[in-house]
Amino acid sequence: MLMKKNASFEDFFLLLGFSNWPHLEVVLFVVILIFYLITLIGNLFIIILSYLDSHLHTPMYFFLSNLSFLDLCYTTSSIPQLLVNLWGPEKTISYAGCTVQLYFVLALGTAECVLLVVMSYDRYAAVCRPLHYTVLMHPRFCRLLAAASWVSGFTTSALHSSFTFWIPLCRHRLVDHFFCEVPALLRLSCVDTQANELTLMVMSSIFVLIPLILILTSYGAIARAVLSMQSTTGLQKVLRTCGAHLMVVSLFFIPVMCMYLQPPSENSQDQGKFIALFYTVVTPSLNPLIYTFRNKDVRGAVKRLMGWEWGM
């Protein structure tokens, strides 16, 4: 009886995605494919360059490489499925596939929230505690911070995704989204989901609001340090590196807050799809451009790498 009531691994979900706008599907396919390729190329470029050039073996670029790898995994967890659904008439995903997708989307999104806090602490230590920076950001400690970001994401996701799929899905298998996400799946349940919705709100507050508060606190201290600087060169370098990180933080947290920290409503469902599309497709493609644009360290690394290749 329980097997009949609950979904089995042979069941499928139908991802409605952008089926309300069939005339946009071809355009969306092309645009999303372009952004996905930019994401792959840009983030792989940062990872490879940071690995090959010894001058970039610093805490800042170590964390940036982790962020790039996170973005690669995050987009790959949902975008290929979306492209397949946009290209052809088949818009289904298996129960097992939906479970795996939800797990990785939650895990990688949570890990990115924590990693952005770690990166803001690195900037705080560099600007406000420059004499103690090498001690504060010891390579071993940096590896521990990066590992903590990943572990917190995957641990939290294991609990949250299990809690989501624990409820019986008694209705149709129509998921009104382009990937498996918690609010869309909760709408398929025929039982009271207030506990799940409360859990979602609490987890969103812990891993969205608290990281954002910590980041803003770090940059408040950085702002005070910047205002007291006498060196124009130092000021420009701080503004360049911290400005890039602040822009990345804004592009990630603002859409996520609009998505998960507002009351659910029927009217906002379509709007939510485009918000989710922004932080899963656009933001990961912009991060490499933001960090490398007019970045002297990256330009120098490219010149050294090209010079080494030509010298060979």
UniProtKB/Swiss-Prot annotation:
- Membrane topology recorded in Swiss-Prot or TrEMBL: Multi-pass membrane protein
Function recorded in the entry = Odorant receptor.
Q: Which GO terms of the molecular function aspect are on file?
A: G protein-coupled receptor activity; olfactory receptor activity
Which cysteines does the record link by disulfide bonds?
Answer: C98-C190
Q: Which residues are glycosylated?
A: N6
Q: What is its main location?
A: membrane
Coiled-coil stretches, from where to where?
none
Q: Which UniProt keywords apply?
A: Cell membrane, Disulfide bond, G-protein coupled receptor, Glycoprotein, Membrane, Olfaction, Receptor, Sensory transduction, Transducer, Transmembrane, Transmembrane helix
The protein depicted here goes by the name: Olfactory receptor 2J1
> What stretches pass through the bilayer?
27-50, 59-80, 102-121, 141-159, 197-220, 238-260, 274-293
Concerning Pfam families, the annotation shows: 7tm_4 (PF13853)
Task: Provide one Gene Ontology cellular component.
Answer: plasma membrane
Which organism was this protein described from? Homo sapiens
Which regions of this chain are Extracellular-facing, per the record's topological domains?
1-26, 81-101, 160-196, 261-273
Cytoplasmic-side positions: 51-58, 122-140, 221-237, 294-312
Q: From the Swiss-Prot or TrEMBL record, state where the protein is found.
A: Cell membrane
What is any one GO biological process for this UniProt entry?
detection of chemical stimulus involved in sensory perception of smell
The similarity comment for this entry is: Belongs to the G-protein coupled receptor 1 family.
InterPro entries in the record: GPCR_Rhodpsn (IPR000276), GPCR_Rhodpsn_7TM (IPR017452), Olfact_rcpt (IPR000725)
